[in-house]
Amino acid sequence: MACLQKISSAIDYDCSNGFVGFSQVAMINKADIQSFVVDASKTVTALNIGSGVPYGVASQKKGFSVSETVRVNDGAPNAYVHEVTVTVYEKENPLLFNQLANGDVVFIAKRSKYCRVYGLYYGLQPTASSMNSNENGGWATFTFTTPEGVLGEDYLTVKDTVYTSIFNAVV
């Protein structure tokens, strides 16, 4: 009976509570970021992308996932390595695939209670991609990681006004 209760609670699970992933994700070309401000609490309070355009990323059903590990630095504070995996649901777009394979990007991701930014200091660069016509509907996945040879990223949140301005411009 306990098994049935668990299945029932999984079916009735409220996906909007923030434990199941991100509700919105935007990808920004690192080169489009003209300036940003991070306050003492490690919150991004300003982000200027000039005429750059943020792109919406599908975040449902593992379409966007993040992992973070600590990079131990000798003679400098430890920092984080961000690794972001994105599923591209568009199958036939050579221009998009080539841009992603050569990109240097930043991601802003919204959960129900907070918003995070990944790759703000150094950008995230492609480290892997996978396209298999026989698996997962033939979709492609791309993995972006903090570059080697840099200190790493801080754990940063994003102020609501910054989040709103970026997501209002998403295409």
Predicted regions mapped to residue ranges:
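Generic detector of leucine side chains in alpha-helical contexts
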Residues: 4, 47, 95-96, 100, ...
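Extended hydrophobic/Leu-rich segments
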Residues: 33-36, 44, 86, 163-170
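Mixed-charge, glycine-accented linear interaction segment located at domain edges/termini
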Residues: 120-171
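Oligomerization/assembly interface segments of phage tail-like spikes and tubes
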Residues: 68-93, 136-151
